[in-house]
A protein has these predicted regions:
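N-terminal membrane-targeting hydrophobic helices
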Residues: 1-130
Length: 130
């Protein structure tokens, strides 16, 4: 279920965003939103490239707590920058949801993660602690 939700949020939900909020140009917007998945190229800069229990939010350069405010600032610019900001922020949210799934499956696995405190706080607020 975790993988389904993760890929649904990455690939299908942006289509809903494009159609609902940018009806006249939804195809272009959807392509831009999908293109923001290129932010995952920062995964190639670490070793190992894939680690099953690693939360990308707060760990990878373009998923860092320094990069996320820049993505928020993009919302205040004109197209296409605001659409890029929407895509990047939604990507971070999607990855964070994935981190929550993993965190609640194995908290000790994330004890050294940069996002540990945030994951713990959000899990407590949502009442999804195990």
């Amino acid at each position: 279920m975790q993988s389904f939700i993760h890929y649904f949020l990455h690939l299908v939900f942006p289509l809903f965003i494009a159609i609902v909020f940018f009806r006249k140009e939804w195809k272009k917007v959807y392509i831009v939103l999908l293109a923001t998945m290129l932010v995952d190229l920062d995964h190639l800069l670490v070793s190992p490239i894939f680690q099953s229990n690693r939360c990308s939010v707060g760990f990878h350069y373009l998923h860092s707590f320094y990069a996320i405010p820049v993505y928020f600032i993009l919302l205040f610019f004109r197209k296409p920058f605001n659409i890029i900001g929407i895509g990047l922020l939604f990507h971070m949210l999607t990855d964070f949801v994935d981190c929550l799934f993993m965190f609640n499956g194995c908290k000790i696995c994330f004890s050294e993660a940069p996002a540990f405190q945030l994951l713990e706080t959000i899990s407590d607020l949502l009442g999804i602690t195990t």
